[in-house]
Amino acid sequence: MGKTLTIQPVTRIEGHAKITIQLDDTGNVSDAQMNVLELRGFEPFCIGKPVEEMPRITTRICGVCPWSHHNASAKATDAVFGVEPASAGKKLRELCNSIAYMEEHILHFYFLGGADFVMGPDADYSVRHVIGIVGKLPDVARQVVKVRHMCAHMLEIA
């Protein structure tokens, strides 16, 4: 008889999820499923809204990468209207995308996944989180917050 492995909660992601892995009698994976436990449901907010509102609305889809959603919807809006942004506009989008890339990866690595690297994958859950990192490496934590703040400020003024 096979075995079922369940990982719940799945940590270090935006939101909550469960992974279920079915093993056959020989221990090989026969099935695997990932279940996201909450409905995002943002699509209905977009229906019937003016297309030029989409870059503002879609930034609320994800707290980790709002700029990526903004940029994708801005490009879609350009396509709807059949316009090509000016060279300066394209360069500004590329600059903002690069800054956001840094900020998003800092957020993901240090705040979502960093505890697994810093505290170790076998560390107790009571310390394997961002506050655990702050306690173990306060200087690194301060620098991470400072760089994220600088990225956010650059995006504000861009």
Model-inferred region functions:
Residues 1-158:
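Catalytic cofactor-binding cores of redox enzymes
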